[in-house]
Amino acid sequence: MEKIIVSGGHQLNGTVRLEGAKNAVLPVLAASLIASEGESVIKEVPVLADVYTINEVLRNLNAEVEFDSTTKTVNINASQQLETEAPFEYVRKMRASVLVLGPLLARYGHAKVAMPGGCAIGSRPIDLHLKGFEAMGAEIHVGNGYVEANVNGRLQGAKIYLDMPSVGATENIMMAAALAEGKTVIENAAKEPEIVDLANYLNKMGANIVGAGTETIRIIGVEKLRGTEHMIIPDRIEAGTFMVASAITGGNVFIENAMREHLRSVISKLEEMNVDVIDENGGLRIIGPEKLKSTDIKTLPHPGFPTDMQSQMMSLMLRAEGTGVITETVFENRFMHVEEFRRMNANIKIEGRSVIIEGISELQGAEVAATDLRAAAALILAGLVSDGYTRVTELKHLDRGYVDIVDKLAALGADIKRVDENGVVVQPLYVTAAKESNEIAAD
């Protein structure tokens, strides 16, 4: 079993460059299926396990997909006849695979997609995707582990109110509506920057979408979309993670291409904790204080505080003076990392949907297991300031969302390495796969 070993006590200094946003690239790649003419060229694609997974889904649907991990570019040609069924073996690894449902339904009037593992209707808002399709005239059948959608002719524009501002539902409905007949209005839409990025991509392809980034999105359907070129926005969650890394170590780190407008809620909370966030040409500089001051955080849909930064901020609050409270309102059961923090001597307790953090915890290195993607990063961050060695396992979660995080932290001054069960330094499997695919392409 691979693990990341961190030795605490090293201040971080230097410059780090962000990757393209994972949460933006997956829907953009799925949306490429709508283009019945031309090729799409997607730039600043992060070299992540999830990107390889969605590329395999697209290839299985008969799209031509080439990923050059060196230039971080994906070329997609979906102009040929596509398959309209995505089987379980390709979708089981990633819930975002359900995003191919809207594009296939809009283009062909039929789509059948396996339900990703653990994605039960009701507990996750995929029901909002399906209600949106039904409002546009589709017939939905759920059974035997699949979602099947059919419509006679074109989808019809509709007025759709989302019971909650689900990012995935907003994206899927927006993609489907791009080819629908007439006007679609999505109310209580998600406002995340990734929604805006997807709308920009669709509009470059020939769609007519206005209002992305607000609670009301209006789409006038068109006859067809064409392939285009698009650059993915920087990853705001990776930015937030490195902000915390600098702050927790009392460091001075410049985050290249970080965008303040995508990070206002995170910056606000960091500044409340005495962290300096300085605008510089091309990014943000984060200077950690001698003493961190605790604060309270409540996760909310954008532009509120992002749930994907909750666990990282928890690690920071472990080192802050005073008592802090984090309340999670977006997802259930997102405090599984608390028990791992306790193994590191954290003074922390759960009360309902809140966590109470008593600083200053004298953190001790321990063997801990990542429970999800962001928890993996949070445990590494805590390890940066722990006494002794922290060993983080279950790295499959980390590889879904962070590119070269070990190398990037090491370049900033962290004592950190990734090793196999024999203690030999290794790279993530997706990096090995990327090198092999590029060597094959070169041949």
From Swiss-Prot:
Report the active site residues.
C119 (proton donor)
Where does this polypeptide localize? Cytoplasm
Residue positions where 2-(S-cysteinyl)pyruvic acid O-phosphothioketal is found in the record: C119
One Pfam family matching this protein: EPSP_synthase
Q: Which GO terms describe its molecular function?
A: UDP-N-acetylglucosamine 1-carboxyvinyltransferase activity
| Family label | Belongs to the EPSP synthase family. MurA subfamily.
Q: Which HAMAP family match?
A: MurA
Name assigned to this protein: UDP-N-acetylglucosamine 1-carboxyvinyltransferase 1
